[in-house]
Amino acid sequence: MKRFLASLLFVTFGIASLSAGEVETAFSPDGKIRLSFSLSEDGRPQYSVDCGELPAVLTSGMGFELMGNSDDLISHLDREFEITGTSRGEFDETWNPVWGEEISIRNHYNELLVNLKQRQTGREMNVRFRVYDDGVGFRYEFPQQKSLVYFVVKEEHTQFAMPGDVTAWWIPTDHYTQDYDYTCCRLSEIREVNSKRMNKNMFSPTGVQTSLQLKTDQGLYVNIHEAALVDYACMHLNLDDKNFVFESFLNPDATGAKGYLQAPMHTPWRTIIVSDDARDILASRMTLNLNDPCKIEDTSWIRPIKYVGVWWEMITGKSQWSYTWDLPSVQLGVTDYTKVKPHGHHGATTENVKKYIDFASENGFDAVLVEGWNEGWEDWFGHLKDYVFDFVTPYPDFNLEEIRDYAKSKGVEMIMHHETSASVRNYERHLDTAYTFMKNNGYNAVKSGYVGNMLPRGEMHYSQWMVNHYLYAVTQAAKYKIMVNAHEAVRPTGLCRTWPNLIANESARGTEYQAFGGSKPGHVCILPFTRLLGGPMDYTPGIFEMNISKFSPGNKSHVNATIANQLALYVTMYSPLQMAADLPENYERFPDAFQFIKNVAMEWSESRYLEAEPFEYVTTARRVKDSGDWFVGSTAGAEGHVSKISFDFLEPGKKYEATLYADAPDADYKTNPQAYTIRKMKIGHNSKLVQKCAAGGGYAMEIREIKK
């Protein structure tokens, strides 16, 4: 099915002026969600969103403040407007993602376009709303006009007024990082929680980042985020905790400006996903649908990757990225590493990498990631150093050609690592050389990183300038047929539909933080509601040894999960890039549990969300692409969970064998995380399962159709 009704059904109405209080409405295709638009007494645009009879977003203001004299109307695009026309239409298509949680996605919405003109200045601004069965997306559009050409945004005043002191699952705003544990509390409590951790990177004691998950007292789940973030600053939210109104706060650049714009242009979409069923938030594809179709003509080279890597041993302190202790500073092209003494803890040695290649080959993995292979790690962090890496020169103990040829002989690919140390100018200068080097040596995927303060100095991680850089690195990679896994980049907004070579991001608190003191057990039960709505995450699951000091004595961190929980993540945390992150020797101690990681599929035909409550539990079933087989994953937070599911997603009349990897009765993420059971059972369409999940636990299931 592919229908383009929009061009046929749009009707334009010319309106001289819409009186204050008069309302334009648009409904979702199923009629459940209502979008209302009006002008206030002073001509300010405003909107509201209802789901059935329940309010999701109360009447909320819209518009911009531009750089200039704040007392002058010329600095304001948030008042004195009149409506000069509206148009409406319906659009319905089904498109096929290059990879994803299903093989086809329906994009069906009703649209309302409102044309606005500022009375005194004649400046034009349009607002386009798209109303889906699962929510509303809207954006600002500035047409070609003489009265507004180049302009600089001081503030965007998009509001999201909440129906009371609702519950929020949130992380604090930060210009530098998204790597926070989530907090669950009422809106009125955010200020107090934030006051205990305020730092210079937080713009407000009531500021939060998107994607923001909320729940009203009437039982509505509301998610606020953005889609198609291109040539614009990342949106945070600032809460008026007296009136419970969020307002957009754009990440500033080094000068304090929020955006340099030129008409004609449009902003990213502001998204509001809403439902009375938490599972619908996970099932929403609105963020993807609001992005442009794929711009890569030949996508045959883009494919899912299951990999291992020389990474966790460095994260935990067992080995090091650097080569020597002898160099307080490094000058690339001048420093001679052959004349210094190796410290003996370097992880990326030819010998060690070959062990990972052997492990990958023996266990059916696609690739091996190696970090710390290139010169410069001795002084890479904290110095605002421009020429920090060249991305092509290996350390003396990393024989790139030998490793390349050895991996090829074993049928294993290598994944490149480009840590930039946030020296973005340096990375862009070297980007084409680095990508050419990759292709010449058989690397088809790269993990990039942006740890540290930005160069150019003073630039923010999520400003307009940096947003443009992250996308530039992806679009340039596409020219070389390179897949990108970007860490420390701006959080995703669905651009993987347009550029599917962006196969993953980090952009949230990943598994590495389990080695930096630990994460809350419920963290993996909130990420699917927040971070993952914009695109897949390289979460790096699969940790089997939770007591890190057993192999890295100086690290006393504990991984707050059970083995069964770690297995479930390969299903609940969707990504076309999945890592078995632990050390090979830890997998060799638990070969029966490791079998699930080896078996779990990477491509899916459909996904079902069986149980969900933010921060508490998530249970997901996915059907293997071009198969009748399924995998199920269930994760539980700090309180544990009794999972009750039906297998009615299985085809009636067929029989299946299920292998269940579950927490043992005495399992607990703190005291007994490695206790698990494995059992097989025969199931069918009418079967049900009641399974206890330990605190920080869960279960994983492999379901194979029994062939006659």
Spans of features found by a protein language model:
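Edge strands and adjacent loops of beta-rich recognition modules
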Residues: V98-R106, F594-R622
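Carbohydrate-binding surface patches
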Residues: P614-Y656, A700-E702
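N-terminal accessory beta-strand-rich subdomains and adjacent acidic, glycine-rich linkers
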Residues: V23-E297
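An acidic-aromatic substrate-binding cleft motif
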Residues: Q262-I357, N363, A367
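C-terminal beta-strand-rich structural cap/linker in extracellular carbohydrate-active enzymes
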Residues: K680-K708
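Catalytic cores of secreted or luminal carbohydrate-active enzymes
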Residues: A564-E611
